[in-house]
């Protein structure tokens, strides 16, 4: 099984408009050679969104770090349990404490092992892969929003999405319902760069601009810092979170 050597970085920023930062991000590796990235974007206002995203990412990262050896064919089940556990923790805290009522969070994650990558998603944070060989940027997730649903069902055109006032309305997030709803997809992996981000990045940078940054020879931490800088330069309309994994070139 291929075990890739790589570098990673993650960074979050409050942006230029919001008064609190409700985004969270992290990356970790374990002794089995697995790589795990996670980005969460909280919702609910005041301190609710911040608390929900912190609960989610702490739960997801702790589950990854404490994961016993798990055969590759069972990793999908493992990720599902991670999502269910995080969802229950947030939902139960919101039900118990009126201060946190209606809080929730998006949660996108990527688990890389050998020649496979598993991508989990609840909400509208995104995962991308970028191939240095083909110079291709590929989105690995679908936004779970009302307008994306309208687009997928043929009720609106793709060109209409960015101009709609309801384009940020989520149809799914962790902590909103007692039962978790999430997507988990499995893709082949051959050393592509993996970027996870909140909507504060992709609403302020086009996919062409994201691809241009990933194609540079800059270090991973420099790319993350540049993503933040450019998103703020383009308005910084929301919190921004990015997590990046890049495989080192072979000698």
Predicted regions, residues:
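PP2C/PPM-type serine/threonine phosphatase catalytic domain
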Residues: 1-251
